[in-house]
Amino acid sequence: MIPGEILHGDGDIPLNAGRPVTRLTVLNAADRPVQVGSHYHFAEANPGLRFDRAAAHGLRLNIAAGTAVRFEPGIPADVELVPLTGRRVVPGLRGETGGALDA
């Protein structure tokens, strides 16, 4: 082994395996692109995005950590969302949740 070397197994590692997936169509009604990061509470995303916010409550994008999805103006996009896990507390952001998701 070389110091700092990372050894990993063969094959792909599935993202969010076993988590329920919610599919929504999102339309960017704004006049410029909007980007949403992997762990952002999707229901509180930019108000220029049109989608079922109630269905997105407590969910985040089903994408790799540290990545984002860019929504171009006027172009509908289908997304997959998975539940936020851990303590399920969302402080701050746009102030619509401001704490525990399950309260």
Swiss-Prot record:
Keywords: Cytoplasm, Hydrolase
Protein's pathway: Nitrogen metabolism; urea degradation; CO(2) and NH(3) from urea (urease route): step 1/1
UniProt GO MF annotations: urease activity
Parts of the chain that traverse the membrane: none
Localization (cell): Cytoplasm
A Pfam family recorded for this sequence: Urease_beta
Gene Ontology biological process terms in this record: urea catabolic process
Superkingdom of this protein's organism: Bacteria
Presence of the UniProt keyword Hydrolase in the record: yes
E.C. numbers: 3.5.1.5
Keyword Hydrolase found: yes
Catalytic activity: urea + 2 H2O + H(+) = hydrogencarbonate + 2 NH4(+)
One GO location term (cellular component): urease complex
Annotated InterPro entries: Urease_beta-like, Urease_betasu_sf, Urease_subunit
Record NCBIfam families: PRK13203.1, urease_beta
Oligomeric and partner information: Heterotrimer of UreA (gamma), UreB (beta) and UreC (alpha) subunits. Three heterotrimers associate to form the active enzyme.
Protein name in UniProt: Urease subunit beta
Organism: Streptomyces griseus subsp. griseus (strain JCM 4626 / CBS 651.72 / NBRC 13350 / KCC S-0626 / ISP 5235)
Organism taxonomic ancestry: Bacteria, Bacillati, Actinomycetota, Actinomycetes, Kitasatosporales
Gene name tied to this protein: ureB
